[in-house]
């Protein structure tokens, strides 16, 4: 029989082994926690978060203001967790410049939400396409042809027709009745953008497209738990995916009709080589039919690009015109200077247009000041594809990168009395002379900067101030209660005014110039 000692020896050995394993496990856990803690310390500063939802409970609309308030406490580069999505927020020109100048290649992607993916035809367009040869081809096509200076100039008559239609409508309104300028500007902007995209479509298609553009903006701008909370992914708890699928089906049918009308018109004009008659759809179809093109455009590419242009260009232009009119009406001295400049340059016998803009520096300064205070896209949105080291912090791959353009435009480090509407700051001696909104000056980038900067910037810089010039030249506008216009912001992808702009319009020009 074995002795007790003999029996205890293996048990003692087992205990020693288990103890060693336990000690090793403790060491592994401690090291893991320490490494994670070290990693967290290397992330930008962050407020306290909650399980599952992260910092979602801290966000109040409009989000750019919430980010601005958090940055005042945490600094110009901070980390937030929106559910299971990690994000960094840049709130100063210096941080934005470092991100774009030093790390552009690593933040050239744009995150695609569940709803946006449907309208983007799975990244077939331009706005959400991954950085790739296809994206680079579309970028060149945009900047050189689709939205380049030549095309913008050739399509000026389309925009002028939309403006004339708006002026006619306002002129026909009884002076005792208020004009819903918000509604009319959206209608004008939508119609102009759709006509620039496809000039041959009948009015019934244009009207349906206007309705769908509005719904798309609402769906894409809505908070969707599927995008942020991993537990909700794939369940479509809010029904946004189902609604988006239905709207996408309708929009796809409409786009097919637009393309069919265009193809029929092109068949009738096979011998027409007049480049000046081409709209955006013509240019896209030309590229699709070009066997020597660097990238072969598919029908989905064409439809996705048209949706990109129509949805991005409509509401933003209307919102900027409305903000600029509201700011000038709330600042009578600036309004007086704009009108005096227009009368000195244009006179009272014709209506101001885009061709007058180079000789209207105060009007353009007022537009820049509006862009500084009220950028239509207050947050530039990117996504990292690789880890970034910036200012001693680590930004992991697959992190959403937000640049708070709205906050940067109000930074007192760059702008004297930053909350004041003062167009003079962009004129000689004003401190901002030579500062342009084209993305090279990081303290002022209402159209973004770098590879993902807004391709429609040139169009916006032409169309918006021209519409404002005509509205202010032709009419005296009066608030219904003779008070200052409310400047509260709505929540959504586009930073628009929250309440409709209802104004009485009184013609200023007698006789009224011909509307041509």
From Swiss-Prot:
The organism's place on the tree of life at top rank: Eukaryota
Biological process per Gene Ontology, one example term: flavone biosynthetic process
Topology within the bilayer: Single-pass membrane protein
Primary residence: membrane
InterPro entries: Cyt_P450, Cyt_P450_CS, Cyt_P450_E_grp-I, Cyt_P450_sf
Alphabetical UniProt keywords: Flavonoid biosynthesis, Heme, Iron, Membrane, Metal-binding, Monooxygenase, Oxidoreductase, Transmembrane, Transmembrane helix
Example GO molecular function: oxidoreductase activity, acting on paired donors, with incorporation or reduction of molecular oxygen, NAD(P)H as one donor, and incorporation of one atom of oxygen
PROSITE patterns xref list: CYTOCHROME_P450
Binding sites annotated in the UniProt record for heme: 454
Entry-linked Pfam families: p450
Localization of this protein: Membrane
Role: Functions as a flavone synthase II (FNSII) that catalyzes the direct conversion of flavanones to flavones. In vitro, can convert naringenin and eriodictyol to apigenin and luteolin, respectively. Acts as a key branch point enzyme that channels flavanones to the biosynthesis of soluble tricin O-linked conjugates.
The protein's name in its UniProt record: Cytochrome P450 93G1
Organism encoding this protein: Oryza sativa subsp. japonica
Lineage start: Eukaryota, Viridiplantae, Streptophyta, Embryophyta, Tracheophyta
Gene, per the UniProt record: CYP93G1
């Amino acid at each position: 029989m074995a002795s007790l000692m003999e029996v205890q020896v293996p048990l003692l050995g087992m205990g020693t082994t288990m103890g060693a394993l336990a000690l090793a496990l403790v060491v592994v856990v401690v090291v893991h926690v320490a490494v994670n803690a070290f990693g967290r310390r290397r992330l930008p500063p962050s407020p306290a978060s909650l399980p599952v939802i992260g910092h979602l409970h801290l966000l109040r609309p409009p989000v750019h203001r919430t980010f601005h308030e958090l940055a005042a406490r945490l600094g110009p580069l901070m980390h937030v967790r929106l559910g299971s999505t990690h994000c960094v927020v840049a709130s100063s020109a210096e941080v934005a410049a470092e991100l774009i100048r030093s790390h552009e290649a690593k933040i050239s992607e744009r995150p695609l939400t569940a709803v946006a993916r449907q309208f983007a035809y799975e990244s077939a367009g331009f706005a959400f396409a991954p950085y790739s040869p296809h994206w680079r081809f579309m970028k060149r096509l945009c900047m050189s042809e689709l939205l380049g200076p030549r095309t913008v100039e050739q399509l000026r008559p389309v925009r002028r027709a939309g403006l004339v239609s708006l002026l006619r409508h306002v002129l026909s309104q009884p002076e005792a009745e208020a004009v819903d300028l918000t509604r009319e500007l959206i209608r004008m902007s939508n119609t102009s953008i759709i006509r620039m995209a496809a000039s041959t479509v009948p009015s019934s298609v244009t009207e349906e497209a206007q309705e769908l553009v509005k719904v798309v903006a609402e769906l894409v701008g809505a908070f969707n738990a599927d995008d942020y909370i991993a537990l909700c992914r794939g369940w479509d708890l809010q029904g946004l995916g189902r609604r988006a699928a239905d709207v996408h089906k309708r929009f796809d049918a409409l786009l097919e009709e637009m393309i069919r009308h265009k193809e029929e018109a092109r068949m009738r004009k096979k011998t027409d080589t007049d480049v000046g008659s081409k709209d955006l759809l013509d240019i896209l179809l030309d590229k699709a039919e070009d066997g020597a093109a660097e990238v072969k455009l598919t029908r989905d590419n064409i439809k996705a690009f048209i949706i990109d242009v129509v949805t991005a260009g409509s509401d933003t232009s209307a919102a900027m015109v409305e903000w600029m009119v509201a700011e000038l009406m709330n600042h009578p001295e600036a309004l007086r200077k704009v009108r005096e400049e227009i009368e000195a340059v244009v006179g009272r016998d014709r209506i101001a247009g885009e061709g007058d803009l180079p000789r209207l520096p105060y009007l353009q300064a007022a537009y820049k000041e509006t862009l500084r205070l009220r950028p239509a896209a207050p947050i530039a949105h990117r996504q990292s594809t690789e880890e970034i080291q910036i200012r001693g912090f680590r930004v992991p791959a697959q992190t959403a990168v937000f640049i708070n353009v709205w906050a940067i435009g109000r930074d007192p480090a760059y702008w004297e009395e930053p909350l004041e509407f003062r167009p003079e700051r962009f004129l000689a001696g004003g401190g901002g002379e030579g500062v342009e909104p084209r993305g090279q000056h990081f303290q002022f980038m209402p159209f973004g900067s770098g590879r993902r900067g807004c391709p429609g910037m040139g169009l916006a810089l032409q169309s918006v101030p021209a519409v404002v010039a005509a509205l202010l030249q032709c009419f005296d506008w009066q608030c219904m209660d003779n008070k200052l216009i409310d400047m509260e912001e709505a929540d959504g992808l586009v930073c628009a005014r929250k309440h409709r702009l209802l104004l009485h319009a009184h013609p200023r020009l007698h006789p009224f110039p011909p509307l041509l």
